[in-house]
Amino acid sequence: MAAKGELVGSKVLVRNDRDANRLYSSMYGKPSRRGLQLWPEEALFLCEIGRLEVRSGNVRISPEELMDRFVEEDPRFPVRYAVYADLRRRGWKPKPGRKFGTEFRAFRGEDERIAVKVLQEELDEFTAQDILEWLKLVEGTEFELVVAIVDNDYDLNYYVFSELVL
């Protein structure tokens, strides 16, 4: 049975404790006083796989409508979402990664941790200096830097960067 969520601004809240606990145990959302707060990528992914039903008032919102609403808030949402959904399908558990200057930090198993920078092939330019700056942000953590490049067809390529000390 799908959890019930309520669209509040650009966030989705799951207020039912049982639903919230079930999702949180799968590394979705962030607990708050108002319920489990899902960020847009999580909410859309859960809708698409049938684990969440989102409503605004009494009106059920389809995954397509949810995508449209999130794009209104952030035109780059589909690019980030493509990476988020791909990581989830590959067994990773992505969370927001802003403190690393990346879109996501993701976990898989006990030891695998990555910080994922998302770039859109046709729009985002970056230099070797940018890569060094991103590496500095993850330096001293257990995270490995991964750059996800999304093309106009939403095909993804992942590149792993690390600093080689000689």
From Swiss-Prot:
Pfam families: tRNA_int_endo, tRNA_int_endo_N. GO terms for cellular component: cytoplasm. GO terms for molecular function: nucleic acid binding; tRNA-intron endonuclease activity. GO terms for biological process: tRNA splicing, via endonucleolytic cleavage and ligation. Belongs to the tRNA-intron endonuclease family. Archaeal short subfamily. This is EndA-like protein. It comes from Methanopyrus kandleri (strain AV19 / DSM 6324 / JCM 9639 / NBRC 100938).
